[in-house]
Structures are given as C-alpha cells and as structure tokens.
C-alpha cells in the first residue's frame, strides 16, 4: 500500500491574480500537495476537500466595489489556518470587520516592511534590521486598495511608510494577511513565510516528492486500468514522454505508444524518439511515417490558423486509424497537466481562468469506447520534469526549449513545403548547437529559427545566388506572457550566420529578430 501523499493539503482560492499558479507551485516546492480552485466554491466542496489550510490569492478587482469577489464565510469558520495575500488580505479584513479603501497611489514594486510585533508567520525571519534592532523585510507590492482598519481581534504585525497594515494576524484563529506577494522571488524571504504557514502553522508534512508521486501514480494507474491495454500518442515532448514512462512502469507491454512522424519535427527527432523509447527503454512503439500526408494536406495553405487546424485534423485521422488496428485497447492516455485542468475549469461567475476545451489527441472514433488515463493531471510542468528525471529521462530532453504542437508548420511562414522544412531543420540545428557550445542555451528561455518565404540576393565565390532567408529568434522570459529579445553577443550571431549560409545550401541571408512581447508574439505564427 502506497503512502497517502494527499493526506496533508492546502486549498488555494483564486481571485484572479497573475501570480496565483506561482503560489501553488511554491507550496508544491515545499513538499505539500495543494489545489487551485476558483474563489466561488461551496461549503460542501471545501468540506469534501478537507484542507489543512487555505490561501486566498491576490486579484485585480477592488474590494470596495459592491460585486467584487468575496471568500465564502465558511472559509473563516472551518477551523483551519487562513493566509490572505494582497487582495486575499483585503477581503479577509473587510469580511471580518475591518475596512478597505481605494488609494490615490498604486503601490507597485519593491518596498521595505518593518516588523512591529512578534508573529508565528515571520518569527526569526528578516532581511536586515532598523537602527533600533527591528526586523526589516524586502518585499514586492502590487496593489491599489489598502486596508485602513484591521478587524478588532487582529494585530498589526508589520507596516511600511505608505501601508500601515502590511501584515496583520489573529494568532489564536491562525489567520494571517500580507499586503505583498510572498510567492515572487522579489520578496526575498517569501518562501520562508510560505513554509512557516504551510509546514509549521498548518502542520503539513513534506509528502509531495518526486519518488512518492511516481509510486502514487503507478499504483493509481494499475488500480484504474488493471490488465487492460492502453494507447498513448507519443510526440517526444515532455508531457507525453513522462506519461509514457509512468505507464510503462505501471503496466509494461500493455501500453502501446503511437508516434506520428508528421515531417514537421526537428532534425533527427523521429530517430531520437524511436531510439530512446523503443531501443533504450523498451517501450512498445508504433512508428507511423506520415510526412507526405501532412504536407499534401497543407499544400497551398498560407493562413497560420488554418495550418494549425489542418495539422490537428490530420493527426487525429492518423492516430485514429492506428488505434483501430489495435485489438482490445480500452484506455486512451493523455499528457494533460494541471495548468490544462485549471484553464478548463468553468466558474458560474465567470471569474475563473479563461475556459477552453482541452484535448491532447482530439476526438476518437465513435465506435471506440475508451476510458481516459491522465497520470499527470495533478502536476505542474516543473514537477513533470522532476519526475521525468526520477524516471531516467535525460536532462537535455526534459529541459529543452518549448516546441509548438504544429511543429515547423508554424515556423515555416506561409505555405509549408518539404524543401522549406528541410532547410529550416538544418539551420535551426546549427543555431541550437552553437547556443549549447557557447553555454548560452540555458541562459535564454527559448530559441529557434524561422523560415521566411522570401528570396534574397547573395554572393558565393565568384557567383551570385538568389536564395531563401531565415530569422533567428531568442527570448528571455519568466512566464512566456511577456518576453524580451535576448541580447546575444555579436560575434556569436556572426558565427551562427556564417555557418548557416555556408553549410545550408539554399539559404543566402540570416537576420535576427529584436522584437519583444508585446507587441510581437514569441512565435511568428
């Protein structure tokens, strides 16, 4: 019997902050399971979840507005510790008898908080000291409204010059509120505060570790599918690869992986996937060469969205055909991860994340009545990678840069042709190889090459050439919501350009994309 790694858990109620998923990831990093729900939960749902503690997230709304989100009153009656962050502190203060007002000045950025009163939340935690020996904390503020009066049974723990109630606490009820964001790295002691709340105040054990997650997932897969056969679409990406390894550990040869080679992959990627998962790890893989079929379907199409839909449709068709060839397959496995689940969650109030339908594979034929196996659906991407390492997958594969689902189909601008894909594959491989050699690959968040459907005059030896143009793209970002173009060294860019033009016959010019996001997107299409 495996250990119950969900025994101690934190419930995070989401009021819409851009940092809310980061709060959840920080709690998981502390070895404690947590779930992220929309703020408008019911008492029955909270009782059923049985949390060891509750965190109220930040949010963009104003608590001074009549219809702004509020925590369910039961949150404060459940008898568990509650931690309000930014908006979460404001709604806690207002709902428990305090007062919140709009501020003429929005406080955004670095601030120093002076600790005035002892509290379990910050005891022994400091960045520096005042002249008279009081602890100071370096924190990150992001708020417009502020608490102007705390509930009568709370005490002021810390303040700033412009924020008199930066931390408030009711130690008896174990209610805490902070006006800053402990989850961001700019709040230097933020992880220690979260650890203090989760591990000490809520008394959660660190049960959520990669090894225990694997044991739990394997046990649950075996319980769910028994001796039945399972099919998985393996792309070679992180999510499907880790899903494949978990299933292989759980059910061995009862797993069949279908690898659809669509002709839109990186250089030698198909061979690498087959070598790694088939030859090295011994998985049962069906390799489906489908380049011609995909390129035929894409012929003549220039619109990026139409290309995405064509690639998705043809993939589903090919996968379905292969699935129908297999006998007695009763389960479809997908690499759905926790952010997909969060995005798919609908809220009656419309305050939750944008709702979208999530399908890794798409629809299966109606005649195939299959159950769904999603062993990663509780995990964030960083957790999936850690589990992949624990399962023996190579670091370079798990931590390589993001690659779009439609592959080179959206990195070849305009119509997709085999000639263009072949040129792009080789140029991109040179760029990535040089980034690794220069120890720059892990210093940028994403790097790739784009094929431009324009010809440019060049000179090669004594002759002129009229060949294609590619653009190099490299960005630095924390969350991929915004990004800066990477300031790569000129000599490095020159070396990459020379290699591509000299080694890839058919390319005469290399340019570098210096657009940020916004206004540009990271991918060109």
Swiss-Prot record:
GO cellular component: cytosol
The reaction(s) this protein catalyses: XMP + L-glutamine + ATP + H2O = GMP + L-glutamate + AMP + diphosphate + 2 H(+)
Active site: 86, 181, 183
GMPS ATP-PPase domain boundaries: 208-400
Keyword ATP-binding recorded: yes
Domain (Glutamine amidotransferase type-1) ranges: 9-207
Entry-linked NCBIfam families: guaA_Cterm, guaA_Nterm, PRK00074.1
Oligomeric form and interacting partners: Homodimer.
Official protein name in the record: GMP synthase [glutamine-hydrolyzing]
Origin species: Salmonella typhimurium (strain LT2 / SGSC1412 / ATCC 700720)
Organismal lineage: Bacteria, Pseudomonadati, Pseudomonadota, Gammaproteobacteria, Enterobacterales
């Amino acid at each position: 019997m495996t250990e119950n790694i969900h025994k101690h858990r934190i419930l995070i109620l989401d009021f819409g902050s851009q940092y809310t998923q980061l709060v959840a990831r920080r709690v998981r990093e502390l070895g404690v399971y947590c779930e992220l729900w929309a703020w408008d939960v019911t008492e029955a749902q909270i009782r059923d979840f049985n949390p060891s503690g509750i965190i109220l997230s930040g949010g963009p709304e104003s608590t001074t507005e009549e219809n702004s989100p509020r925590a369910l009153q039961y949150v404060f009656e459940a008898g568990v510790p509650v931690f309000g962050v930014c908006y979460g502190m404001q709604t806690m203060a207002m709902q428990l008898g305090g007062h919140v007002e709009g501020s003429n000045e929005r406080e955004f950025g670095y601030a120093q908080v002076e600790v005035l009163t002892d509290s379990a939340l910050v005891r022994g935690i400091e960045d520096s000291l005042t002249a008279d020996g009081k602890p100071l904390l370096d924190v990150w503020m992001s708020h417009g409204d502020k608490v102007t009066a705390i509930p009568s049974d709370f005490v002021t723990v810390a303040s700033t010059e412009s924020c008199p109630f930066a931390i408030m606490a009711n130690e008896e009820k174990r209610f805490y509120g902070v006006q800053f964001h402990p989850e961001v790295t700019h709040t230097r002691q933020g992880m220690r505060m979260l650890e203090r709340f989760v591990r000490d105040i809520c008394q959660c054990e660190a049960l959520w570790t990669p090894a225990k997650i694997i044991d739990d997932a394997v046990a649950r897969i075996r319980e769910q599918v028994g001796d039945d056969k399972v099919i998985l679409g393996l792309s070679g990406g992180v999510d499907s690869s880790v899903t494949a390894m978990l299933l292989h550990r759980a059910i061995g040869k009862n797993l069949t992986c279908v690898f659809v080679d669509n002709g839109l992959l990186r250089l030698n990627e198909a061979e690498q996937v087959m070598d790694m998962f088939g030859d090295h790890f011994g998985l049962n893989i069906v390799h489906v060469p489908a380049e011609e079929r995909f390129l035929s379907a894409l012929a003549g199409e220039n619109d990026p969205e139409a290309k995405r839909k064509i690639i998705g449709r043809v993939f589903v068709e090919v996968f379905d055909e292969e699935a129908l060839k297999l006998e007695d397959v009763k389960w479809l496995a997908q690499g759905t991860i926790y952010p997909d689940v969060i995005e798919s969650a609908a809220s009656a109030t419309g305050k939750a994340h944008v709702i979208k339908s999530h399908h890794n594979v798409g629809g299966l034929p109606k005649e195939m009545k299959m159950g769904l196996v999603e062993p990663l659906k509780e995990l964030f991407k960083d957790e999936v990678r850690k589990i992949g390492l624990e399962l023996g997958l190579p670091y370079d594969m798990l931590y390589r840069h993001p690659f779009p689902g439609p592959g080179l189909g959206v990195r070849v601008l305009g119509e997709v042709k085999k000639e263009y894909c072949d040129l792009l594959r080789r140029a991109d491989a040179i760029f990535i190889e040089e980034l690794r050699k220069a120890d720059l690959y892990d210093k940028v968040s994403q790097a790739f090459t784009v094929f431009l459907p324009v010809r440019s005059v060049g000179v090669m030896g004594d002759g002129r050439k009229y060949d294609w143009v590619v653009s190099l793209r490299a960005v630095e970002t924390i969350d991929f919501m915004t990004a800066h173009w990477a300031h790569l060294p000129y000599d490095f860019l020159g070396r990459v350009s020379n290699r591509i033009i000299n080694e890839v016959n058919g390319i005469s010019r290399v340019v570098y994309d210096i657009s940020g996001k916004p206004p540009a997107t990271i991918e060109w299409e």
